[in-house]
Each structure stands twice: as C-alpha cells, then as structure tokens.
C-alpha cells in the first residue's frame, strides 16, 4: 500500500434523522455535508487512527472540521497533482476537482 490509496466514502453523509417533508409516504434521510465518514488506507495516509468528531447526534462536525474540498486537495497532494492544473471539460467549460474552492491539504491525515 505504499503507492496505492484505498478509499471508501463519498463527499457527503446522510442526516441522522428520518425526514418526511412532503406529507406523503416518502420517508428518507437527506444529504448531509456537515458530517460524513471516509475510510482510507495506504498511499501516504496515517495508519490506524481517526480524524475529527461529530456532535452527539452525528449531525455536524465539531472537531478537526474539514470539507470535501479539503479531502480532495489532500488526495491530489498524495497523488502528486496540483489541484488547479488537473482539469476536465464539462458542458464546454474547463473545470477543476476543487471548482475554484480553497481546499487545503489536511496535515493530520498524512503519515
């Protein structure tokens, strides 16, 4: 795993409560970008630890708060890629993974 990153997760979690905003039998848990989980191994990530913490409901991060742009910046750093140089076209527009957002490398995740 020295040169391979194994990642399991997504850019957002799910709310820790069941919602029914429509008044019909349409129950579910909406997206939650304020509290989410990732599992990573190898490729320069620190082994055997956790980073961050949510409130007692699992709704919002309360310790070592990061967002998905920070996580993407950290991945790109470990891959040796510059976030503003890695581009792709979408609907005729050059895009970057961070989409102009100020993602920062998360030192606490690095080995």
Q: At which residue positions do the language-model features occur?
A:
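Ligand-binding pockets and gating/stacking loops
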Residues: 1-111
């Amino acid at each position: 795993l020295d040169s391979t990153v194994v990642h399991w997760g997504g850019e957002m979690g799910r709310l820790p409560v069941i919602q029914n905003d429509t008044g019909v039998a349409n129950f579910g848990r909406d997206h939650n970008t304020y509290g989410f989980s990732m599992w990573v191994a190898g490729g320069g990530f620190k082994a055997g630890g956790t980073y961050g913490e949510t409130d007692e409901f699992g709704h919002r991060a309360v310790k070592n708060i990061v967002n998905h742009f920070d996580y993407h910046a950290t991945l790109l750093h470990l891959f040796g890629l510059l976030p503003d140089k890695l581009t792709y076209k979408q609907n005729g527009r050059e895009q970057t993974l961070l989409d102009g957002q100020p993602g920062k490398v998360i030192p606490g995740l690095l080995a």
